[in-house]
Amino acid sequence: MQKTSMLTKEQANKRRQWYIVDAAGLVLGKLAVKAADLIRGKNKVDFTPNQDCGDYLIIINSDQVVLTGNKKENEFWYHHSQYIGGIKKVSGRDMLKKQSDKLVYNAVKGMLPDNRLSRRWITKVHVFKGDKHNMEAQKPTTLNWS
């Protein structure tokens, strides 16, 4: 009888790597799906759904990501200031100009399942507007998702 081996937390921590992706010209949804799979560890042979076995990801040039269709005009993001009448509405065009890092971060977060483990996974994503970042010490490997 064949025994199934499960990945332990210590083994997963030893195998973590840092990756960097240039988001310039990439479609937002496709970028978010690939990023979510990478930080979950679904690209690994020893993927275990109940363990945090994913890698770290740095996304640069988030201000050059592409929104397809009419999402720039017809899609809105809402937040509330907790005061009466304090609902704020931001269009895709404004979100891409002012808070593109938050736009990409929320897209990746939306591709993850809603559980306790996803709160640990989302901490592995680091999004930057330009091509400069402060993660050089980790020596990230470049991924080409174009």
Swiss-Prot record:
Pfam family name, one: Ribosomal_L13
PROSITE patterns per the UniProt record, alphabetical: RIBOSOMAL_L13
Highest taxon above the source species: Bacteria
UniProt keywords, alphabetically: Ribonucleoprotein, Ribosomal protein
GO biological process: negative regulation of translation; translation
Gene Ontology MF terms: mRNA binding; structural constituent of ribosome
Example of a GO cellular component annotation carried by this entry: cytosolic large ribosomal subunit
Reported function: This protein is one of the early assembly proteins of the 50S ribosomal subunit, although it is not seen to bind rRNA by itself. It is important during the early stages of 50S assembly.
Family from the record: Belongs to the universal ribosomal protein uL13 family.
Protein's recorded name: Large ribosomal subunit protein uL13
Name of the encoding gene: rplM
